């Protein structure tokens, strides 16, 4: 008898069938072996037709949903219809044998090709475990020098040798330059702030002096231009020569006094008021004489 074992727990499949050359490819229910707890199927070798004196049999499993599949625990082989089936070798002894017992031997011979040239499934030998034994020596951390940081490693080694035997209180303490900069930065920033404040006060005082000077100069020039414009405007009027001479005689002292006051740059309001009063008086006399002359001329023209 030949026994085919489904090498998985029986509870994974509530129902399992097998079909192969020994069942004429019809699904036949498998049975659970109570001792092993796995699905099994037994058949007689006489029910199998041997092809070309090769002791092997092809088969597939069928689950509870009717799906046909080949199990990975058995070697696989593709038939002439491109169907992938499980294959198991048979025992030639008279007392029979088990396909499950011969499964390992079938794995070793599965690399042989069948009659149609199809190659059997074969995983190959296992990779040997590499040995870690050897005479490899690793350099110590103090003497190891890398290609990228050889100079740094040498400098570190020299420093370690230098302070190797020195007492702890004599070993110089290297200070971080960043900390020194942090200690100096407050004094430096305070001096900069004081210098900036002094410069700002000096610039502010100079700006105020310049503004006062400009205001005085602009005021003097404006007053001079206004007075000259008013005087020149009075001289260009079409008046009688005699009246113009009298007006000029009267206005000249006032103009001279106004110009002298303006040139001196006195900013008192009383002086400006007196100058304005004199100018207004001169203008009033001028317009009064001009008006009298105009009325006289108009009356004479009407009489003629």
UniProtKB/Swiss-Prot annotation:
Keyword Ribosomal protein: no
PTM annotation (Phosphoserine): residues: 140, 185, 205
Biased composition (Basic and acidic residues): 73-83, 155-183
Membrane topology: Peripheral membrane protein
GO cellular component, one term: endoplasmic reticulum membrane
Gene Ontology BP terms: nuclear envelope organization
Segments for region (Disordered): 72-269
Keywords from the UniProt entry: Endoplasmic reticulum, Membrane, Mitochondrion, Mitochondrion outer membrane, Nucleus, Phosphoprotein
CDD domains in the record: E_set_AMPKbeta_like_N
UniProt superkingdom: Eukaryota
Intracellular or extracellular location(s): Endoplasmic reticulum membrane; Mitochondrion outer membrane; Nucleus envelope
Subunit structure: Interacts with ULP1.
Name used for this protein in its record: ULP1-interacting protein 4
Originating organism: Saccharomyces cerevisiae (strain ATCC 204508 / S288c)
Highest classification ranks of the organism: Eukaryota, Fungi, Dikarya, Ascomycota, Saccharomycotina
The encoding gene: UIP4
